[in-house]
């Protein structure tokens, strides 16, 4: 029984079927060949062979009764195998996730250690922000590809802002609306008389009439520190800045704005739309791209003073030439 229990039900059924077949062959052989039958000669009777056949049939019936139990057991085994496979998949997925987490944690620990080392080195050797700005300025000065329209050679404010510009910028003061440098014609609050060109003087050697011009082209009203991005904190934006913000390049007339000789006194500037007094035909002030910074107004005023002195000297030389020619004509008449 123990040996039969160790074997599978299929093997037991096959073995019982083979035994029944052999016993059945022996019975048929004995009945057909009684004289030549080996079983009869050895003392075995047909009755014993039939009993053996009945015993084999009984064993087969017992095995067949065990079939439903074995079927239930097999179905349970298959169900358990399916559940085991599913659990294996879940375990494999969790294992993969754990390995990925381990790799990510190892990387983050490595990078965190590097960052901590860099932070410790930076704490041991602090660097001023002004030094970084200077170095970045040197790098951008030699490797940059674009610049603002108002930038000139030697302008230290490009392209990175200074610390005071950070403090007065829109990030710290979001309510203050500031604009870039304004190149506007100021109102004629302080007018200066200048002498016109010799061509405008009278033909009889008389003195030329005096004319007045407005304030310098650069707006002298400064409000706070200058920044190439925020300006002096002006609230209004010039037409040129509006064109630059829209992506339109101003033409040469808008930058130079040369006064035409003999123009009316109520002419308006194309930049600000404010009335502007006509200047002398010989004095043409050409200022292009000067940013609104402290110190530029004095330079413009110095240029105007030099031009005024040159015009005065030319007028005096022309008047002396006219006096000399008049004296010569009088001597000839005498």
Swiss-Prot record:
GO biological process: regulation of transcription by RNA polymerase II
Protein name per Swiss-Prot or TrEMBL: Mediator of RNA polymerase II transcription subunit 4
Record gene name: mdt-4
Presence of the UniProt keyword S-adenosyl-L-methionine in the record: no
Bias (Low complexity): 188-203
GO CC entries: core mediator complex; mediator complex
An example molecular function term from Gene Ontology annotations: transcription coregulator activity
Family in the record: Belongs to the Mediator complex subunit 4 family.
Protein role: Component of the Mediator complex, a coactivator involved in the regulated transcription of nearly all RNA polymerase II-dependent genes. Mediator functions as a bridge to convey information from gene-specific regulatory proteins to the basal RNA polymerase II transcription machinery. Mediator is recruited to promoters by direct interactions with regulatory proteins and serves as a scaffold for the assembly of a functional preinitiation complex with RNA polymerase II and the general transcription factors.
């Amino acid at each position: 029984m123990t040996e039969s229990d160790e074997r599978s039900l299929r093997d037991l059924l096959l073995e019982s079927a083979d035994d029944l077949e052999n016993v059945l062959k022996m019975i048929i052989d004995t009945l057909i060949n009684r004289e030549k039958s080996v079983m009869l000669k050895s003392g075995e009777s047909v009755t014993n062979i039939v009993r053996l056949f009945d015993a084999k049939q009984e064993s087969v019936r017992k095995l067949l009764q065990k079939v439903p139990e074995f079927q239930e057991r097999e179905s349970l085994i298959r169900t358990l195998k399916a559940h085991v496979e599913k659990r294996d998949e879940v375990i494999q997925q969790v294992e993969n996730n754990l390995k990925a987490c381990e790799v990510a944690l190892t990387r983050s620990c490595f990078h965190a250690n590097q960052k901590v080392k860099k932070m410790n080195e930076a704490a041991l050797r602090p660097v001023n922000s002004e030094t970084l700005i200077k170095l970045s300025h040197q790098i951008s000065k030699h490797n940059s590809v674009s610049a603002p329209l108002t930038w000139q050679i030697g302008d230290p404010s490009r392209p990175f802002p200074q610390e005071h510009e950070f403090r007065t910028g829109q990030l710290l003061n979001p309510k203050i609306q500031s604009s870039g440098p304004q190149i506007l014609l100021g109102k004629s609050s302080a007018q200066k008389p200048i002498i016109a060109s010799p061509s405008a003087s009278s033909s009889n050697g008389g003195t030329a009439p005096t004319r007045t011009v407005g304030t310098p082209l650069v707006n002298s009203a400064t409000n706070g520190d200058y920044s190439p991005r925020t300006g002096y904190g002006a609230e209004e934006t010039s037409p040129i800045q509006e064109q630059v913000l829209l992506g339109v390049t101003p033409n040469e007339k808008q930058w130079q704005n040369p006064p035409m000789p003999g123009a009316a006194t109520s002419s308006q500037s194309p930049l600000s739309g404010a009335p502007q007094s006509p200047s002398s035909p010989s004095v043409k002030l050409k200022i292009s791209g000067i940013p609104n910074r402290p110190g530029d107004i004095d330079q413009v005023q110095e240029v105007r003073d030099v031009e005024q002195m040159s015009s005065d000297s030319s007028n005096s030389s022309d008047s002396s030439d006219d006096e000399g020619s008049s004296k010569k004509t009088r001597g000839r008449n005498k």
